[in-house]
Amino acid sequence: MAHDRKNSTAGRNLSLAISAAVAGTGSAQAESDAEDARLEEVIVTATKRDLKLQDTPLSVTAITDEEITLQRLDNFEDYVGQIPGLALSQREPGANSVIMRGCAAQGLSFSDSATTSVYLDEQPITSAGYNPDPRLVDVARIEALGGPQGSLFGDAAQCGTLRIITNKPDTSVSDGWLDVSGWSIGEGGAGTDLSGMVNVPLLEDGSSIYPDLKAAVRLVGFYANEPGWVDNVLTPTPGQTSTNSNRVDDDVNSSVWYGGRAGLRLEAGENWTVDLTGIYQYYEMDGFGDVSLNQQHFADTSVFPSFGPHDQARYTEDYWEDEWYQIALTLEGNLSFGDVVLTTAYYDRESTYLADSTSYLQNFQQVGDYFRSFNTGNPYYDTGGIYDFGGYPIANDFDGRQTNNWVIEARYATPTDGRWSAIVGAFYSKRQVDEVFMSNVEGLTGTGAFNYINYAGYYVGIPMKSASNNWWTGVYDSDLKQSAFFGEVSVDVTENFTIKAGGRFYSIENDYIVMNGTLIGMNGGIPNCAIDYCYAPGDLGSSDENGFVPMVNFSYRWENALVYATYSEGFRRGGANSARPQSVFGPPSDLFDDPAGTMNSYESDTVINHEIGAKTEWLDDRLRFNISYYQMTWENIQVQAEDPQDNIFTLGIVNFPEADIDGVEMWVSWLPNANWSIEATVGRNDGELSQAQTLFADTPGAIPVPVGTELPIVPDVKRHLKVMYQLPRTLLGGEPYIMLRYTYTGESVNSLAGIESISFSPPVVQQGSWRTLDIQAGIETDAWSASLYVDNVTDENGELFFNNRFAQQRLTVNQPRSFGFNFRYNLGGK
């Protein structure tokens, strides 16, 4: 949340990083400063070269270290409003989908591959629906690359790439800072944030053996205790047989973050650099920040409470824990014949959650009651018995996931001082994901569900031997290997006109294993199909894929302008669904009749992008206006849907024919004079299905999805405005300022026609527009800085996401109005 972070570094100009100093005490000085003020040149690495942002013929949004610090940006939610093409489908930090340019086909993603890649330095850490949320402490830059980036960034860079780039050790200076923040949420608790950084050169003058060798270390640490603002209120269970009195609590979505980074840099002369970096982060949340709604089970307000904007009803513990680390090594050589880079990184993540699923299991109970009405008298044929939890279940879900990923990339870039230049490289990654999911029902032993499974066990010679609350367990493992060769060549046809062409040859292998069933090991664990009641034992096999994605870019430069046109493609790998064999998504099998197993595999999908844009500077570099217009065709879309068969309740991926996505992105930066700075971004996006689809056309549960069906999650309009005024006189020996930020998020829908939850038919919701206003005032000196702020001044209650996951629809909301302070002490150096 944007309520606990840093003010600007001491000595930094606060007016949008104006390169000339603007502090003055008289009108003559102010006029001189106005003439000298210039917008800062931001260097980005979006093309895997160091280029000025205004010289990069791509749609790139860059948020610098100074702006991250000044605006107190901590995580995805804090900066999503500033990037025109970026959207989030968020349940909680560490469990969200990052979406660029409208490439979303479902509200919640449980698939294996995303449409937007997320990079931490040189390594992809993308995880569809489960993206980690690196805390932005001592981060050099955020880069958001709009549109397909498949040629340089590969799989999942289908519609864009989000890059988080950390600061590296500096061998030239000792530097550091200490930072403390505190804040209070008007309808919640109070929080604190402590962080610090130390940079120390070790060999400034080299050594006797290697006189040109320099070294430095950079150490970063942080701890944050973030308050909650959602209350778990006293509520009867859906069956009205008990209440959640033992779980009632205030501010249940409080959280703790801590972690750090250690970096070592070696510089051998001016040509060679080695960086070794280790990053660690831990995140724990005591409850989820989604609220309950008076609909479905809770519709009767004569029985259930009338929920307020920050109220929820939970009957078991909600909990989220996310822990990960990354170790990375990068070697860079700047040689006479070009630049070479060799980078490798290892990433390891463990995440666990508990989630109340009482309302969800109550829906299953009602389905079971319906099927049991057709019982023939033989308990084995009581097909609804497996959902008989005694009438009024209290239940929770457990999920534990471990991910490790190793990548290596080598690339060579030619010098750029001639008429042509090129970059070529090779990439390899190996990722393993092991996941265990359990659904647990209190007092399951003795219920109809237990008796049904026990009877079935006797029937097949595997009787149950002990009591258990474990109703369902799934184990889902995958091993993914990717390799690629990529390259781009640029030719200056004239002094001003450049053509760039490139592409990526890729090869992907993915092996899947799924096991799921009931009463697993009686007391938890993983399925052992020799003794447990299994649905899908064993190896699901593998999927292999090879292909090529191209890119062509044309750019023309004037003195203060650049125009460009791009054709590019992005891809997302195909695969196989992890489902039980009765499902249409299950593995092919002779055990069940069609349609079982008929939709087990799904193909890769492709985005074809046509884009034009311009980057311009005016008024002696005091006004910057950039714009990009894109038309994208999304072919063979991977869509998450629920099996339409009765009594199956299984999700899988299917391919839809096509969608069209059109949009505009705009960026404005303006320095009216030495004291004012204004920044604005605007994004418009329109995505819809361009071909009709009848989902499950050959089954009784066929669902027509018409042309014009809106793609979910991404708002139709986004606007962000930042205005800053720096007072012309000093105060307490420093430079005082006032800053306002305004963010508008337009309307969107939460689901693609509701197809990911067919059985319980939660409504497709139009998520309303919302806006926030933040005000901050501060002072900066060479030695320290301080600020006071109010976030969400108008106490806007934004509808972030209507979550259909647990059948009982929930709403994720933004943080209410908060008041805070920040103090930073500079330890010296720059």
Predicted region positions:
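Outer membrane beta-barrel strand-and-loop segments of large Gram-negative receptors
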Residues: 370-409, 466, 599-603, 609, ...
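N-terminal periplasmic accessory domains that precede
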Residues: 76-77, 97-99, 119, 144, ...
